[in-house]
Structures are given as C-alpha cells and as structure tokens.
Amino acid sequence: MAQTPDDISCELRGEITRFLWPKEAELLLKTWLPQEGAEQSHILALLRWRAYLLHTCLPLRVDCTFSYLEVQAMALQETPPRVTFELESLPELVLEFPCVAALEQLAQHVAAAIKKVFPRSTLGKLFRKPTPSSLLARLERSHPLESTIPSSPCGGFLETYEALCDYNGFPFREEIQWDVDTIYHRQGCRHFCLGDFSHFGSRDLALSVAALSYNLWFRRLSCEDMKLSLEVSEQILHMTSQSSYLEELVLEACGLRGDFVRRLAQALAGHFNSGLRELSLSGNLLDDRGMRALGRALATNATFDSTLTHLDLSGNPGALGPSQDSGGLYTFLSRPNVLAYLNLAGTDATLGTLFTALAGGCCSSLTHLEASRNIFSRMKSQAAPAALQRFLGGTRMLRHLGLAGCKLPPEALRALLEGLALNTQIHDLHLDLSACELRSVGAQVIQDLVCDAGALSSLDLSDNGFGSDMVTLVLAIGRSRSLKHVALGRNFNVRCKETLDDVLHRIAQLMQDDDCPLQSLSVAESRLKQGASILIRALGTNPKLTALDISGNAIGDAGAKMLAKALRVNTRLRSVIWDRNNTSALGLLDVAQALEQNHSLKSMPLPLNDVTQAHRSRPELTTRAVHQIQACLWRNNQVDSTSDLKPCLQPLGLISDHSEQEVNELCQSVQEHMELLGCGAGPQGEVAVHQAEDAIQNANFSLSILPILYEAGRSPSHHWQLQQKLESLLGQVGEICRQDIQDFTQTTLDTTRSLCPQMLQTPGWRKQLEGVLVGSGGLPELLPEHLLQDAFSRLRDMRLSITGTLAESIVAQALAGLHAARDRLVERLTQQAPVTMAPAVPPLGGNELSPLETGGLEELFFPTEKEEEREKVLLRKRNGTPSWQLRGKMQSRRLGRLHAVAEKHWAAGPRDTPASAVYQRVDVCVGWVPPALLQEGNGLTARVDEGVEEFFSKRLIQQDHFWAPEEDPATEGGATPVPRTLRKKLGTLFAFKKPRSTRGPRPDLETSPGAAARARKSTLGDLLRPPARPGRGEEPGGAEGGTSSPDPARRNRPRYTRESKAYSMILLPAEEEAAVGTRPDKRRPLERGDTELAPSFEQRVQVMLQRIGVSRASGGAESKRKQSKDGEIKKAGSDGDIMDSSTETPPISIKSRTHSVSADPSCRPGPGGQGPESATWKTLGQQLNAELRGRGWGQQDGPGPPSPCPSPSPRRTSPAPDILSLPEDPCLGPRNEERPLRLQRSPVLKRRPKLEAPPSPSLGSGLGSKPLPPYPTEPSSPERSPPSPATDQRGGGPNP
C-alpha cells in the first residue's frame, strides 16, 4: 500500500484493508467535504479501477463510490487543494485535501487508470478549467508517455476488460484471461473470435466486445454460425463507430436483420478514421433497405474508397433486388475504389447492371468476383452482354470469375469468351460456368471460342446437360493450350453406351497425350460405374495428370482394385478423390496396400461415405485400411511438412518470446528507476529521464516491428515468376534425366541379353525385370519436383535467416539502449543519495579488542575468493590434482594460514598485557574459543579430554534429550554470536565414523540396557583413555547419566553426551581431580571390557602437552609418531555411521578436537608467573613421573617429551566442538543460525524428529566478551541437579 503525507493510523488502515478485501487499495488519502470541514474528515481509498469515500469512524461505511470510467472531467485547484469530479452517477463531487501533493497523487492515479482503458486519451481532455497550467505541466512531466508504458498482453485488453467488469458490476471471467494470455498473445494472433467464448452469456460477450473498442492489438473480429443477441450487437456497433484499428469485421450467419445493417451504415458513415478493410455480412437476412443504406454510407464516406478491399454480402436473398438497380450499392461500386474481393452470390443481383457498375469502378483492381446464383438480365437486351465484354476488356488482375447457376444465354457466353480472348493482360483465370444450362448451344459456342481464350487456365462445365455433345467438346478442350484444370461432371447423361464409351476413350486419350497441358480432371457425380475403368486404366501411362476426382461414380470394389493397380505404377498423381463409390472394406484395403508402394501421392481425402458403410459390416478391416492409408499419406508429406514448419517456427520460438519477455522486464525496471528518481532531480536527472523514455519507446517499437519482419520473411517476393522459371528449368533437367535413365536401361538390357540369353527367355524372370524397370521409371518424374521443393525450402530458410538476424540486431540495440538508460538513472540516484559517515573508532580499553581484529576476522583467517581460485588453478596445473583432492589441499592451506597468523599474533603480543586481553587475542588468532562453561548444577568445570572415547567408539548419538550447562543470564545477554561465514568454513573439519566391527545385524543388547557386556576390538579411543583407578566402581546408571531420556521408546539405541568426553583426552592436576571427586563412569557396559589394552603413555603425554600450550621440538621420531597416530585416527575413522559429506577434508590432529581446560580463574596464569599455575605444573609433573615409573617405561626411540617452559604462558586452546560447524544433514532441515554444530547421521538410521532449541551455550561468549565470572566450586551430584532436557551441549535442541 502506497504511503501518503497524511497521517492515517495503522488501526484504520487495517480496518480499511479488511473492509475492502479481496480488493486492495493502492492509495489512501485523507480528505473532507468543503461543507463539512476538516473536523469531519474522510478517507478516499483509490483502488485499481474504483474509488471509495469512507467515513473515518468505526465501523466503516461508504459515503459514495464511483468508477474511474464514470469520470467525465476533473477540475483541480491549488489554493485550497481541491478537486471537482464530473460523474455520470453524481452531479458533482468536490473534495478538499490537506496539501497539494495529495492532490497530485490523486490526479496521477486516476489519469493513469483512464489511460490504460483509453490509450489515445490526453490529459487536456480530462482536466478542465480552472486547473492551473503549472499543475497540468507537472502532471504531464510525471505522467509516463503512452510509448513508455510496457504494454500488457494484447495491448492491455485484459485491463480494459477488468475495468469494464468493475464498471458494470459483472464478474471477471478467468477463462477469457487465459485465452488472451495463452493463445492470442503467445501465438501473436490478432483475430478475436467470438465463437471461442460462445458458451458464455450474452453480457460476458458484450463486455469482451466493448473491450475491443479502444484496443490497439486486435485487428479482426469474427462471428460465424452463432446468433448474436441485442446486447452484443449494440457493442459491435459501438466498436465499429469508435475503433480506428479494426480492419476486418466478419459476421456470417449471425441472424442479423435489416435494422442492424441500417445502424451499421450510420456508424460507418460518421467514422472518418475507420481502418476497415474487410466487411462480411453473408448468410444473414438483410433486406433491400438495409443494403441501400449500406451502399450510401460506403459511397458517402470517402475513406472506404481507399481502404475497403474485401466485401462479402452473399447469401442474402433479395438484398439486391429490382429496387437496387438504380442506386444503393451499385453507386459505391461505380466509384473508383480498391475492391479486390467481391462476393454477391445469391443476392438476386442483375449481372448486366453489376458489370456496368464494375466497368467504371474497380475493374482494374478486382481479383475475385463471385456472382453465382444471380440473374443475368431482367429483360432481353444487348446492353448486358456489351457491359460484360467491357468489364472483361478493362480488367487487369482478375483470377476468379464465378457465374455458376446464372442461366447464361448464348450471346452472354459468346461475349464472355470473346472478352477473354481479346484481353491478353490477364492469365490463370478460373471460370465457373457450372449449372448454367448451356446445353448443346452453349457447347457449340465453347467449341468455337475456347481455343482462343488464352487467359483461361481452369474451366468448370459441370451440370450443363451436354450429353452426346461431350464428344466434340472434349476434342475442343484438347486443342486448348492453356486449360490445365477441367471439370466435366454430371454431363454424361448419354443413353447410348457406345457414345458414352467414345466420350470416355477420348478423355482417356486426352489424359495420355503428351502435348495436352491438362493437369486436373473431375468427372464427379457422373454415375459412370464400370465406365470409369476406362479412365482408371489410363492412369498407368499418363504423363501430366496430377489430380483426379472420380467421386460419385459407383465404381465398387472392382473399380477400387483397378485404382490400386494404377496407383502402384503411377508417379504423377498428387491428389485423388474417390468418395461415394460403394466401396467395401476390401476395396479400401486394396488401395491402402497399393499406397505402400506409392511415394508420390500427397492428398487423398478420406472417403467418409464409403468408410461409414464399410465400418458397419467389417469394422476391424475398415479401421486397419484407414490407418494404413493415413500412415502412407503422412509418410509422403513428411518432407514437405518439416521443410515448411521448421524454418517458420524456429525464429518465432527463439526470438519473439524471449526477446519480448526480456524487453518488457527491462522496461519495467527502467520505469521503476524513473519513478524513484522523481521530478526534482535537476537538469541532469531530467535528461536521464528523457533518454530513458526514448529507450523504452524504441524497445517497444522493436517488438512491434518483429511480426512485420516475420511476415516479410515468410511471404516470398516474386513467388510466381520464380516458380515459373524454376519449373521450366527443372523440366529440362527432368527430360535429361529421363533420357539418361532410358539409355541406361537399354544398355543394361543389351548387356544382360548378351551375357544371359537363356535367362531372358524365362517368362517369370522377364516379367520381374519389367516390373523393376517400370518402378524405376518414375524416378525422373520425381526428381524435378523434389528439386523444386528443395529450392523453395532453401530460399525460405535464407529469407527467414536474414529476417531473424535483422530482428535480433534491432532487439539487441534496443536492449543496449535500455541498459544504458538504467545505468544513467542508477548513477543519478546514487548522486542524490545522502552520504553516511562511518562512526568514529572508540579508544581501546584494557580488556577490549581492536576493531580490526573483531571486524576483520574472516579476512584474517581466510583468503579472498580470488586468491583461492588462483591457488586452485596453480595446484591443478602443477600436480594435475583431481577436484576432490584439491579441496583437501585448499583446506590444509587454510589451516596453515591459521597457525601462521596465530604464531605471528602470539609473538607480537606484549608481555605486560592483562590476562583477559591476552586470551582474547589468542582467541582471535586461533578462531575464537570461548571460555569453557561450567557444568549445570554441580559447579565443576568441563574436563579437557571430554568426548574422545565415543569419538572412536562404535556407538551413535541418538537420544533426543541432551544435557547442557546453564548459562548466567547476565553473560548470555552480552554474548556476541560467531560470524556465520566463520562457522561455515570451520564446519567441515571433522568426519565422525563408526568402526567396521560394529556393522552387521544389531543384537538385542542395544535395546536392553541391562544385558551383559561382550568383548570388542580396542580402538584408538581406548588407547587414549586414562587407566581405571582402583576403588572407582561402576554405577548402573552411569551408562546414561544425565542424558537418559524419560521415554523408554527413545532408548532403543544408546547415545553419548559430551560429559563422557571430559574424562578421556587430558589428565587434570591432582587438585582438580580432588575437586572433582569420584564420578560415575560414563562408559556404557558394551564399552567396558576386561580385555582393554593399556593406553599409550607417550600419546597421553603428547596430547596433554599440546592442550596446555607447550610447543615441542621437531624431530624425526616425533614425525614418525605423529604419522603413526594419524594413521590410527584414519583407520578408526575409515568405517563409521556418521560421515561428513566433505570426504576430501584432510585429517586434522587431535589438538583441534578438544575443549579449553577450564574457565576457572584459579587455573589461569597471572602476571609475572605467580598464582596457582606453578602448583599445577608441579603437581602435574609429579603425577607423570610416578605414573612413568609405575608402568616401567623403557628407553624411547626418539627424544622424549620436552619439559615445559618455565615462563608462564597462557595455554593455547583450540576451537571447541560447539563452535565447529559440521556439514548439515539435509534430513535435519535448515541449519540453526545460532547453533553451528550439527552431526550428520548415518544413512542407515531412521529419521529422527527435528530438534530446535535456543542458541548453544558454547556461543555464549563472543569475540569481545569478557571472561565469565567464577562459579561456585562445590560439587553437586547429578541426582540432585538433573540436567535440562531442553538443551544439548553439542548443539542439539529441545525434544519435539
């Protein structure tokens, strides 16, 4: 919700949001009515398409509401800030505002909403006086231009439709939205078809049509075979009178009557900016008065003389009756216009009057004239034939002339053919003279003049009752050198069978004539029966016939079998139509099997009548035949389909969708930056805004030009001339190939005859050879056609490639301009942003860390990403190391940097630094180890050797309740959390595994805590464990200790806590041992065996010395012992349950796995080396010597452990496992930001419930925190202080 300068309480905003739900208010303004004053204020809630005036008192109620489409005008006033609305529903609405800024926000919001619905509207029409010119100028500068707004799909159709639904109170139909977004926009379709939404009500259709009135995307509105209601008709009339982008209006068979046409005529007569190019009103009930009004409107408005190219008024009987002969539509047709398509079939028009009007009007531009089922003349006169001859003499581009069913008299037919003979400028004309009742007289006229009519290429003479005159008529047609397509159906009503056979033989001879240009023949609906076999047999040797229509001749199964034989050898036919021939399933199967060997037939419309009849008797066989026919036709058309679709669809998919999306997103981004920059950005800012607007305008123009380029790439220029030249050239190539094949065949036969004379005398082999030769004879016929297809495919690919390259370059330039504009806007925004100074660094106190050390912690420990990348490249180049080993080496280098930086900071530290500061500096150097926390309840410090025994043991951590120490609330509040990056990088150092000996089926010992222990193989953890002390018995509850769960179901598998770690790694001094006292042994029964091996004293001493910070001299023996120890660790960790995901991490020394010794101040060194530290060293040395003599150690291989340095120094501590973040298990959910440690479970374990808890206690001290205050040292037994089940010392969480 947008913020306003007015103060509106959050409670009131929430109430308004709930009141308007599910609608959302985009702007809330505080206002009041002038007569009531500011004391009784209101809230003006501006939604997307509607405004609500609400009372501020609760409960809310609406004072008034209005749609933005109701706003007829607005008047703005600055002093006082006031707006006056002129609405349809209200006489006048005056509102006052507290400031001018709120008034400008209101004006901008309403103007932007109206602009989306009416894209061509301007601010000057909306804002009227007394609006100040300065305010209007500011609104124009802040209001985005029409070209700079990234348009929604299909020119904002959905926004307009939504606004109209809100205006009329109708529901918004999501199906219309889906169709517009998915079909129309994605496919670039600008044709809005009302038939797609015919299942909606009339009001929904009316709203969708009303949304087209001001839409700039759709160019065509069509409705076919659907009756239109009155509401839809009204909106169509409104759209016709308003839209200047509507180019095609098709209303066919919609039940329209004369009153609709009269009102349509009024709308067209007054719309001088109309872009209508096509008007189709066929199949309606239009009367002569409506047609007269339409003709006058077209003649009155001079715009249609240069725009209207397509007019279809067919199927309206009586619309052009006798009353129209003197005017009406003929007035418009007699004017010079650009009509190219005119269809007046079935309108009772007089052809004589029509040709007279056309001769003085559009005869030069007319290409298609359909005047079928009309009257040639209402009286016998010579004027009509003369008008026809004049029209044919003046036409230049006519390609179709339909006069079917017009009952032409002989003189009219003679005038027609003579006019075509005299006009040498037209060619490839299709003349339809079917059902004209020409009979013998017309046949004689055709025989005399058809040879001279060179413009004719297609002639339809069906159903003219020629009868026996067909003999001479066929001979006359054969003499024509221009006729390529002839239709002679329904003319074979000859009683004499010999005459019929003579006609059919002449037609067959015409088909087989090499000099005859005939390519298509139709004898449909002639009932030839067995006579059709004469024509079918002629198909075996026809040289040029490519299309044959023998439907409706009742040829039966015998004729189908003959057709199948002809198709096996014919390679010229491309189309065969043979429906309504009484063919059964066997006949269909014969044709299907023949098509398996025919690779040239492209089209065979499914014979639906015969298939329906055959399916009733033998459905399985019929289905099989139909599928086989369709598969063969698909195979024959596969090459053409891929060559046609691939170059057309590929550019559209790769360029249009992606580029449009990218441009729209970038335009939106630039628009947002422009709004952020605002108007008061100074002169440089205004220049940047203007440049951004120009860039958006250019980008939108580049998207609008893409469809034009694609259409230009698809439509080849000079296609007809190029095709003619290629056909003539490829015809010569075909002749040469045919001659070559014939010569090759003859040579092959001669050679075979000379080599195998006896084999040629075998009848079967000779017949087989002839079949092979006949099959190969069609190859020369297919070669020119394939070459022609390949030539056009390659030309189309080249055109589309050029178009795509040009389109990509245009879009690239537009995108570059948008990027540059956005960069300039961002630069201006950064210059306007206030400069904030960093706070001064405070002086450091005695116990404070340096800001450099605390703030640059990651830079201190870890290299930058660029340095790591360079090191990776160098390592890979030197050793060819795989990536999994390379990551291990990089981890080792990181640890090396850690120790190097730690040594550097340790050597550079002053000796007189207080202990707390020294500890903080060491923490920074080695990764920030917080002071060890005291255990809960008993006040004892955690042992340093805590956790090693189960680190190498075979058991897994499974319990849900973990034991954790309590923190002091004061300390917890001042703690600083570990940086997240540090915890991430330190989290992959360890891998927890179980020994190989623990694999296999689990015994019942795991589920029964009281079971007897069994012997097991000793591990390195056993070797490092301190020797058992006499007198310390094992308690039954020691296995679980403080970590036992009250739920028995959760004890199916034992789990260790960190308390057991505290007694395994480092030996404590005698004083601390005494303070600790006797403790219950935390080892489980399965881990305490009688056969435990004695731990290595050297290892224990080495570990202890490393924990207290004493460095050791380097030597060969030390290196060997270290390698041996690392090998033991690797061996112990090779097989385990809990594995780390980063297996390439190198093994880390045990030093990194331990806690700090103690947080007690008594254990810390004081200044000057005085304090409890000296006693600790003395006691520890006595204990080591006594234990060494008691065990009887001999001479060692290398130098023994070095004596501790006499100078007191703080013990070096390593990061505690609490802060070492392990790789998180994806099964455990997201990592807790305050608890970095998370053990990864074995994949064999079942999924445990996710544990969530407050931050781990180990994170209680940050880098800059002070040492914890001393806790009481009085021990308390675990029985008196039970552990809290809500926390886990290892980073667990509460029990869910």
UniProtKB/Swiss-Prot annotation:
Span list, region Necessary for localization at the cell membrane: 975-1002
Record key words, sorted: Cell membrane, Cell projection, Cytoplasm, Cytoskeleton, Leucine-rich repeat, Membrane, Methylation, Phosphoprotein, Repeat
Region (Disordered): 988-1296
Protein's cellular compartments: Cytoplasm; Cytoplasm, Cytoskeleton; Cell membrane; Cell projection, Lamellipodium
UniProt cross-references to Pfam families, sorted A to Z: Carm_PH (PF17888), CARMIL_C (PF16000), LRR_6 (PF13516)
Biased amino acid composition, Basic and acidic residues: 1079-1091, 1118-1134
Modified residues (Phosphothreonine): 1145
Subunit structure, as described in the record: Forms homodimers. Interacts (via C-terminus) with heterodimeric capping protein (CP); the interaction inhibits CP activity and hence promotes actin polymerization at the barbed end of actin filaments.
Protein name: Capping protein, Arp2/3 and myosin-I linker protein 2
Organism: Mus musculus
